[in-house]
Amino acid sequence: NEWHRKNDPDNRLISRATRFRMPSMILRDWALANAGLLVSKVGGQPVYPYQPDKVWEALAITKEINFDYPAATGDDLYRRSIYTFWRRTVGPVNMFDSSDRQACRVKPGKTSTPLHALTTLNDPTWIEASRFLAEKIMLGTKETSDRLETAFRHVTAQTPSVAKLSVLERAYDEQLAIFKQNPQEADKLLAIGEKKRNLKLPALEHAALTQVCLGILNLDQSLTRE
């Protein structure tokens, strides 16, 4: 604002900057942290979080062809991305903007490729994070409108406008109607990820709120450092 421009023209207070999409590894950690799943343990061996089967096979060379990805369990699934195992020839598939490892880079690149959405909308880490975020909100609030407002504020640090809240409510109602017609799909959604869901919560409402939370996590204002 004008006060900062006048009193801090050199931005020594770091009070302003251009907006940018956060790097993939930061986004993964951010999603886990929003859900309360991020493990803060420091140090240790590399970990092997969720990854599609044989996704590295086409890029393998020589003896790497026989490499079997030893999928992690327990807390290792939720460690910070800095501990994720890297192959010599290719990085984790959920980090589209990571270094190509052909040359040294002092900072990560940033991307807005549409392929990024394949991860943020479908990766088990993101779906599980959305599920736990929804669970946490359902345990703390009762009314649907309160739950949606809480989810939006929790992720974006902003209070939703009446128009935005109306969109969230409409999205929730649509998802709830879909799951009422196909309750087995709600069970499938809530089964994604290693951690078990809270069976005390109604499955249909939990699944609908999970989908809305996933949408909120994928908003531009969520994925972008303002």
What are these regions (language model features)?
Residues M138-T210:
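C-terminal structured "cap/appendage" subdomains that terminate the fold
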Residues N1-D146, K195-E226:
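An acidic, gly/pro-interrupted, aromatic-rich
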